C-alpha cells in the first residue's frame, strides 16, 4: 500500500495483513531513494547550501547527492544554461539510468531569465534540451519551494504505472552542433550520433563571390597593364 496515496493508513494495527501490487511496491521503494545530481551554473544553486543544512535537512526524504550521473535518477538544474554548456547537460542526462527525472529550478533555467533578452548564447528554457518533470519558478526559489517540488515529484512517482513506463520508453533529445534538437531514443553512451552532426559542405560546392573578380584579372594581359601604366605616366607629365 502506498503511503503517499493513502496517508491515513493505520500502521499500528497488530496482526494485520496488507495486500498490494508489485507496481505499488516498486513505487514505494523509489520514493525514499531519490539520488539527485546537482547541476548548478549560477546564483540559484546557492540555495542548496541552506537546503542541505540542519534547518531543512533534505536527507529525511532519502535524497543522497551523487557526483556521478550513472548513480543518479534525478537531476536538478539551477541557473542559466548556455549553448556551450548544453552538450554537457545532455550528455549527463543521457548517462543517467532509467527511470530518470528532471527538476528545473529558477527562472533562468525555465525561460532563460534576464540573460536571454538579447543574448545569442543562452538557451531559452532547459526543456528544449531535456524533458522536465517539475518546474520550480523563482529568482531564486526558497528552500521550502524546493522541498515542495520534491514532494510533487514523489506524488508523481507514486502514481506511475510500470507497464506504461516500460512500454513507452522516455525519448531523449539530442543536441547537434548547429543548434538543432532532435528527439532520439536513449543510447546511454554519452557520444553523439555522427549522422546528426553538422557536416560542412565541400569547398568546391561553396559559391565564391570573388570568382568573377579573379576571372576578370586573369583575362587582362600584362601588355594591357603596361599600356595602362604608360598612359598614366604621360598624363602626369603633361600636367
Curated annotation (Swiss-Prot):
Cofactor binding summary note: Binds 1 [4Fe-4S] cluster.
List UniProt keywords, sorted A-Z: 4Fe-4S, Chloroplast, Iron, Iron-sulfur, Membrane, Metal-binding, NAD, NADP, Plastid, Plastoquinone, Quinone, Thylakoid, Translocase, Transport
What PROSITE patterns does UniProt report for this protein, alphabetically? Answer: COMPLEX1_20K
Q: What class of enzyme is it?
A: translocase
Q: Which Gene3D superfamilies match?
A: 3.40.50.12280
| EC nos | 7.1.1.-
Q: Name one GO cellular component term.
A: respiratory chain complex I
Matching entries from InterPro entries are given as: NADH_UbQ_OxRdtase-like_20kDa, NADH_UQ_OxRdtase_20Kd_su
Residues the entry annotates as binding [4Fe-4S] cluster? 43-44, 108, 139
Which parts of this chain are annotated as the region Disordered? 217-239
Task: Tell me how this protein sits in the membrane.
Answer: Peripheral membrane protein
Q: Name one GO molecular function term.
A: iron ion binding
Locate the compositionally biased regions of type Basic and acidic residues.
225-239
Q: Which cofactor does it need?
A: [4Fe-4S] cluster
> Could you tell me where this protein is found in the cell?
Plastid, Chloroplast thylakoid membrane
Q: Which reaction does it catalyse?
A: a plastoquinone + NADH + (n+1) H(+)(in) = a plastoquinol + NAD(+) + n H(+)(out); a plastoquinone + NADPH + (n+1) H(+)(in) = a plastoquinol + NADP(+) + n H(+)(out)
What GO biological process terms does the UniProt entry carry, in alphabetical order?
aerobic respiration; electron transport coupled proton transport; photosynthesis, light reaction
Summary of the function given for this chain in its UniProt record: NDH shuttles electrons from NAD(P)H:plastoquinone, via FMN and iron-sulfur (Fe-S) centers, to quinones in the photosynthetic chain and possibly in a chloroplast respiratory chain. The immediate electron acceptor for the enzyme in this species is believed to be plastoquinone. Couples the redox reaction to proton translocation, and thus conserves the redox energy in a proton gradient.
Sequence similarity: Belongs to the complex I 20 kDa subunit family.
Q: Subunit details for this protein? A: NDH is composed of at least 16 different subunits, 5 of which are encoded in the nucleus.
Q: Which HAMAP family match?
A: NDH1_NuoB (MF_01356)
Record-given protein name: NAD(P)H-quinone oxidoreductase subunit K, chloroplastic
The source organism is Acorus calamus var. americanus
Organism lineage = Eukaryota, Viridiplantae, Streptophyta, Embryophyta, Tracheophyta
Per UniProt, what is the name of the gene that codes for the protein in this document?
Answer: ndhK
Amino acid at each position: 500500500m502506498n503511503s503517499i496515496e493513502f496517508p491515513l493508513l493505520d500502521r499500528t494495527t497488530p496482526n494485520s495483513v496488507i495486500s498490494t501490487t508489485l507496481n505499488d511496491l516498486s513505487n514505494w521503494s523509489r520514493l525514499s531513494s531519490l539520488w539527485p545530481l546537482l547541476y548548478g551554473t549560477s546564483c540559484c544553486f546557492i540555495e542548496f547550501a541552506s537546503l542541505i543544512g540542519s534547518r531543512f535537512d533534505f536527507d529525511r526524504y532519502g535524497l543522497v547527492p551523487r557526483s556521478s550521473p550513472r548513480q543518479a535518477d534525478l537531476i536538478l538544474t539551477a541557473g542559466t544554461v548556455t549553448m556551450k554548456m548544453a552538450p554537457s547537460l545532455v550528455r549527463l542526462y543521457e548517462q543517467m539510468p532509467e527511470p530518470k527525472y528532471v527538476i528545473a529550478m529558477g527562472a533562468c533555467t525555465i525561460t532563460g531569465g534576464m540573460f536571454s533578452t538579447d543574448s545569442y548564447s543562452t538557451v531559452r528554457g532547459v526543456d528544449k534540451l531535456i524533458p522536465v518533470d517539475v518546474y520550480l519558478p523563482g529568482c531564486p526559489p526558497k528552500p521550502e519551494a524546493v522541498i515542495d517540488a520534491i514532494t510533487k515529484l514523489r506524488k508523481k512517482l507514486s502514481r506511475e504505472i510500470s507497464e506504461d513506463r516500460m512500454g513507452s520508453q522516455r525519448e531523449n533529445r539530442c543536441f547537434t552542433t548547429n543548434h538543432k534538437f532532435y528527439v532520439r531514443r536513449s543510447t546511454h553512451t554519452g557520444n553523439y550520433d555522427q549522422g546528426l552532426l553538422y557536416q560542412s559542405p565541400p569547398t568546391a560546392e561553396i559559391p565564391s563571390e570573388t570568382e568573377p573578380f579573379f576571372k576578370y584579372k586573369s583575362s587582362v594581359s600584362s601588355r594591357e597593364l603596361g599600356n595602362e601604366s604608360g598612359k598614366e605616366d604621360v598624363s602626369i607629365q603633361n600636367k
